[in-house]
């Protein structure tokens, strides 16, 4: 049978609003209760004017899995990603990561190194004079001894396919866009996280660089990292992920293996998402009775 998977990150009934103050949130609940609905129903009804970016989201990330997050801009994926390592704390519900409660400030700080987040276009956050300094920034901040920092810089550059002796002393801005992104990845890997969270990691790359990056991410996963990847490319998700969670209007719309999720082509189409090319082909053949 399958081994029981160990949860590394758990979200339980998480809701988050960018626009409502705590007082307004209480009023919103009260108003719904007065309207004779349970507050949950009123909150999570498909109200397009809803000020909630996340609505009652429950989700578990298991150790060692490759989890895909899909959904349109505005579906809540990016807000969700920022909850995974305490960058945003939930206003309702709770998040536990690596056994720690992220509503606790001290615990949230401890988790930041262990759950590494690579945001969209991460090369825009490069700032140091040399590649080495940029990658060393995180480990230095952890207060590690210099020889350990050096070891991590070399090993994380090599994990993203860059050679310290070739690029270490260069300015990150002398490198190609794809290489700059690798340097940004290395900076997160140098923290030696247990979970790697990637928000649209292939955004803006040409097809060849995309393929290289997917291979890189796949290799990091095979080497033992738990990976959560946000992507609007259904093909990428179908190729890499063990499990996919589809977000829509701040709530979990569907979840399952790629085959389970993509079997619901019509429902996905209704929220503006396609299915991967291979899946479309299979559907077309099935419809043609082949």
Residue spans for each PLM region:
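Conserved ABC transporter NBD signature motif
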Residues: 93-103, 111
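Conserved catalytic motifs of ABC-family nucleotide-binding domains
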Residues: 192
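Conserved ABC ATPase signature
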Residues: 171-175, 179
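Helix-to-loop junction immediately C-terminal to a conserved catalytic motif
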Residues: 85
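The feature captures the beta-strand-to-loop junction immediately N-terminal to the Walker
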Residues: 70-72
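Catalytic Walker B motif of ABC-type/P-loop ATPase nucleotide-binding domains
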Residues: 196-199
